[in-house]
């Protein structure tokens, strides 16, 4: 069965999802995009991407549509999700990537428009379930769950990083820092913002800010509820982020044992979600990597009961690939 997908919001994540769907060859079709921008601008930003480069096929704007290669995708411009013709278009799953409709009550308007399921591309509130692939995908119940959150890019990285470590040596407590690429929520120049640190110029500063990943981890790994805390450091790079997780382990271990646990996981049950590297990589090496987490083996440290592990992630491309994977999982159960 080909899963028919609608995208609501054609910003960074929406366009990354579109590109991932076009280049992966998965059994998934982007049927329509809803965004209030003009079609010519949307097509241009899809064709020319400052991080991913040129779209692999020719992209053109047509009346009410974008043509990418041999595929024509309908473009809608509707403010009210309930008014979208998802049912008429035969859409199975809507990927909600505006960043606006993150409450389940608002996201459910897509169902009123005829969609069967909605995946929120962000941490959500009042959702039926939050799913991080590789961690708790078995929690998804197609009979009970209609509004699904894919959590955040950081939670997808942290979830995999923490689960492998917890399964191997146990986690009593821990602290996570994500050194994160700047995002559209920050300012290019100093300007008012509700977070006074994010008010400062993103390209000139290391910006400490909050991260909900530690709290969200309890949604997908209930056994770690309340055991982790976290914050973020936004840095002047456009993509390529890294999670530093330091924990108190439940038992003694060694660097070698920890590395072996991740190597086995990456080659086995977590293949495609977790990658393992011993190369001395930096953030630009992660751009375009589809994994949720790239484990940096050479940064592993053990000191007494303290264990430090580090995982890289392309906060846009990796996350967008998980949205595709989750849409396939959800679609296969319809």
UniProtKB/Swiss-Prot annotation:
From the UniProt record, list the coiled-coil ranges. Answer: none
Give the Enzyme Commission number. 1.2.1.12
User: Where is the protein localized?
Assistant: Cytoplasm
Per the entry, what modulates this protein's activity? Resistant to pentalenolactone.
Matching InterPro entries: GlycerAld/Erythrose_P_DH, GlycerAld_3-P_DH_AS, GlycerAld_3-P_DH_cat, GlycerAld_3-P_DH_NAD(P)-bd, Glyceraldehyde-3-P_DH_1, NAD(P)-bd_dom_sf
Pathway assigned in UniProt: Carbohydrate degradation; glycolysis; pyruvate from D-glyceraldehyde 3-phosphate: step 1/5
GO molecular function annotation: glyceraldehyde-3-phosphate dehydrogenase (NAD+) (phosphorylating) activity; NAD binding; NADP binding
State whether keyword NAD applies: yes
GO BP annotation list: glucose metabolic process; glycolytic process
Q: Which PROSITE patterns match?
A: GAPDH
Q: Which UniProt keywords apply?
A: Cytoplasm, Glycolysis, NAD, Nucleotide-binding, Oxidoreductase
Catalyzed reactions per annotation: D-glyceraldehyde 3-phosphate + phosphate + NAD(+) = (2R)-3-phospho-glyceroyl phosphate + NADH + H(+)
Entry-linked Pfam families: Gp_dh_C, Gp_dh_N
State the family it belongs to: Belongs to the glyceraldehyde-3-phosphate dehydrogenase family.
Quaternary structure note: Homotetramer.
Q: What is this protein called?
A: Glyceraldehyde-3-phosphate dehydrogenase 1
What organism, scientifically named, is this protein from?
Streptomyces avermitilis (strain ATCC 31267 / DSM 46492 / JCM 5070 / NBRC 14893 / NCIMB 12804 / NRRL 8165 / MA-4680)
